[in-house]
């Protein structure tokens, strides 16, 4: 499973730096439509290559399968989920979650509690158009904060209901993106397949209670 990953050409500076988050005051907000918005902060986690290596090594990555019509197909990525009462696998994840919780508490009104991780091994791994609408995300404004480590991949967004991609964010190497407001129920996001991916990527998604 993990052996399928193509080589990751990380920056020697990224690997040499202390692995730690920077300040959040450089965040840039993009207002979408219908009360949705996206915040973006490139390179929030310095030295993120170290975190990537640790997570690849220590996580019990799970290869999911799903029923599709008459066939059972492999989900094109590896996953691991940590609920609000579970211990996160790396102390830096606790730090990232707590910093984001404090920053967004005035808007969200509650902390981020869970962490879902996805490992995109190469450009063939992907996630289709969707919103995080399991639980309260289908009816309430919420926040999903995503920290990316490893090689960059494109996060695409479009209004719910179909149509062309309206916004693209290149995410990797410690980048942060936060989807907020009505984004999960009025917009969709995806990680498209890529023929130009330069290596594997891990997406770390922090969510509040009751949002998946």
Which residues does each predicted region cover?
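Non-heme Fe(II) oxygenase metal-center motifs and adjacent flexible, charged/small-residue loops
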Residues: 1-212
């Amino acid at each position: 499973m993990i052996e399928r990953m193509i080589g990751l050409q990380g920056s020697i500076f990224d690997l040499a730096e202390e692995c730690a988050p920077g300040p959040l005051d450089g965040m840039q907000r993009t207002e979408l439509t219908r009360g949705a918005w996206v915040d973006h902060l490139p390179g929030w986690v310095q030295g993120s290559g170290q975190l990537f290596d640790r997570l690849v090594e220590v996580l019990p990555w799970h290869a999911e399968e799903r029923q599709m019509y008459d066939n059972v197909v492999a989900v094109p990525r590896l996953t691991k989920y940590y609920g609000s009462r579970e211990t996160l696998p790396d102390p830096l994840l606790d730090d990232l979650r707590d910093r984001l919780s404090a920053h967004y508490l005035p808007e969200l009104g509650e902390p981020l509690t869970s962490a879902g991780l996805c490992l995109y091994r190469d450009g063939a791994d992907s996630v289709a158009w969707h919103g995080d609408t399991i639980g309260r995300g289908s009816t309430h404004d919420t926040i999903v904060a995503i920290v990316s480590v490893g090689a960059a991949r494109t996060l695409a967004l479009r209004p719910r209901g179909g149509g062309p991609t309206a916004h693209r964010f290149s995410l990797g190497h410690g980048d942060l993106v936060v989807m907020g407001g009505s984004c999960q129920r009025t917009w969709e996001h995806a990680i498209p397949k890529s023929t130009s991916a330069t290596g594997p990527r891990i997406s770390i998604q922090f969510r509040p209670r009751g949002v998946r």
